[in-house]
């Protein structure tokens, strides 16, 4: 059956040439990102358990994880958690299959604890966190939709969007958080995982505003704190030259009041310890960024089942499509993908698969159109590859 693929030329100024561009990334220790990470870790653990016990991934969604902030008393050289962070793992899961009972809650709790251990290395999971799990069973009609055919059918009428390539600012914002928490943190453990990077490009001038929670046990006093933020600033300024030739100004923790020693200091490295709650889907999109200059889906990707949940599959698929179009069709300057499903219809047959293309100057759109259609059709023909990549941990969701 022919697919409803529509490729059109988009007549607008490419993002890279627009006057104002905004890009945000919430770091892996931001409460919203923690929620995303927990939800996805639980989903992937359930997938592995279902495959091990039942031979197939069964219906589940764990995309409602909530974090209720605790209370803390950070200080230089230490600090303590006064009230633990409360984490509620919420969703739906298949708990019995053909007479086999499945320990879904135990699997979920184990996966969540392991994710926190790997992500927030300064958190004491015995003292600092209360973990709860409430997984209900899925509705019978959706479970039926889940298992009808070889090609899964859509669980909902919904859409996913993606774009490529990243702009200079998008690359810079994404890699600033990644490099600070992988490279610099290995030498400067006082950098907390709770970080937000906000990028503004005004013409040829870029401002990066970085809000980074510092960990008190590794910092002796205010002077040490100031030195650390200055070293971070220098690191980012030097790193930025690898991503752009534009002017870059770096600002660290602009909310600090050094006169009163009111600074972003934490015990564990996340503001979830003191007043900052978290929810799935309130942070980064599945490409790792929040990009108001681009079309975005408001739907959470993390925690949704990777078999037929359009909120997950089509957002990931559209992003992969866009990236491959840019790789394989070098005449494309910007491409935006939109995929729309109908509930109960095969996910390889979207109601529409739309590509909006801004070709490079002097390029034949007819050539671009034909080559983009081939990439899109190939991905739709192999749509279940997205499921495999998710289960293997090859695709990020935030």
Swiss-Prot record:
InterPro entries hit by this protein: AdoMet_synthase_2_family, AdoMet_synthase_3, S-AdoMet_synthetase_arc
Disulfide bonds: none
GO biological process: one-carbon metabolic process; S-adenosylmethionine biosynthetic process
Binding site for ATP: 136-141
GO molecular function: ATP binding; magnesium ion binding; methionine adenosyltransferase activity
Enzyme class, spelled out: transferase
Enzyme Commission number, as recorded: 2.5.1.6
Catalyzed reactions per annotation: L-methionine + ATP + H2O = S-adenosyl-L-methionine + phosphate + diphosphate
Cofactor(s) for this UniProt protein: Mg(2+)
Keywords: ATP-binding, Magnesium, Nucleotide-binding, One-carbon metabolism, Transferase
Functional pathway: Amino-acid biosynthesis; S-adenosyl-L-methionine biosynthesis; S-adenosyl-L-methionine from L-methionine: step 1/1
PANTHER family per the UniProt record, alphabetical: S-ADENOSYLMETHIONINE SYNTHASE
Family to which the UniProt record says this protein belongs: Belongs to the AdoMet synthase 2 family.
Function: Catalyzes the formation of S-adenosylmethionine from methionine and ATP.
HAMAP family: S_AdoMet_synth2
Name by which UniProt lists this protein: S-adenosylmethionine synthase
Organism encoding this protein: Methanosarcina barkeri (strain Fusaro / DSM 804)
Lineage of the organism: Archaea, Methanobacteriati, Methanobacteriota, Stenosarchaea group, Methanomicrobia
């Amino acid at each position: 059956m022919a697919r409803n693929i529509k490729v059109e030329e988009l007549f607008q100024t490419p993002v890279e040439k627009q006057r104002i561009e905004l890009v945000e990334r919430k770091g892996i220790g931001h409460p919203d990102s923690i929620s995303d990470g927990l939800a996805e870790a639980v989903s992937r653990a359930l997938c592995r358990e279902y495959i091990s016990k039942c031979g197939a991934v069964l219906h589940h969604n764990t995309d409602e994880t909530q974090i209720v902030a605790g209370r803390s008393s950070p200080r230089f050289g230490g600090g303590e958690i006064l009230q633990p962070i409360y984490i509620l793992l919420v969703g739906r899961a298949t708990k019995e299959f053909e007479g086999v009972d499945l320990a879904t809650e135990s699997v979920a709790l184990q996966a969540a604890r392991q994710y926190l251990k790997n992500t927030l290395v300064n958190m004491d999971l015995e003292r600092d966190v209360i973990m709860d799990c409430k997984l209900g069973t899925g509705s019978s009609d959706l479970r039926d939709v889940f298992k009808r055919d070889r090609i899964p059918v859509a669980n909902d009428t919904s859409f996913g969007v993606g774009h490529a390539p990243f702009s200079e600012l998008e690359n810079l914002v994404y890699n600033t958080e990644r490099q600070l928490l992988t490279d610099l943190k290995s030498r400067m453990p006082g950098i907390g995982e709770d970080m937000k990077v906000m990028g503004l490009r005004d013409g040829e001038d870029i401002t990066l505003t970085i809000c980074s929670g510092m960990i008190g046990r590794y910092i002796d006093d205010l002077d040490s704190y100031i030195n650390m933020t200055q070293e971070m600033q220098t690191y980012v300024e030097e790193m930025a030259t690898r991503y752009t030739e534009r002017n870059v100004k770096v600002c660290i923790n602009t909310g600090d009041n050094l006169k009163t020693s009111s600074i972003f200091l934490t015990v564990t490295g996340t503001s979830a310890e003191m007043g900052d709650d978290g929810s799935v889907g309130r942070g980064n999109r599945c490409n790792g960024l929040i990009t108001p200059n681009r079309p975005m889906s408001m739907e959470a990707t993390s925690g949704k089942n990777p078999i037929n949940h359009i909120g997950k599959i089509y957002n990931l698929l559209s992003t992969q499509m866009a990236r491959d179009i840019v790789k394989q069709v070098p005449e494309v300057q910007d491409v935006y993908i939109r995929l729309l499903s109908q509930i109960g219809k095969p996910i390889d047959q979207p109601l529409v698969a739309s590509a909006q293309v801004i070709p490079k100057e002097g390029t034949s759109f007819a050539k671009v159109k034909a080559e983009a259609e081939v990439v899109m059709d190939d991905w739709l023909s192999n749509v279940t590859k997205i499921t495999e990549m998710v289960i293997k941990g090859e695709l990020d969701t935030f």
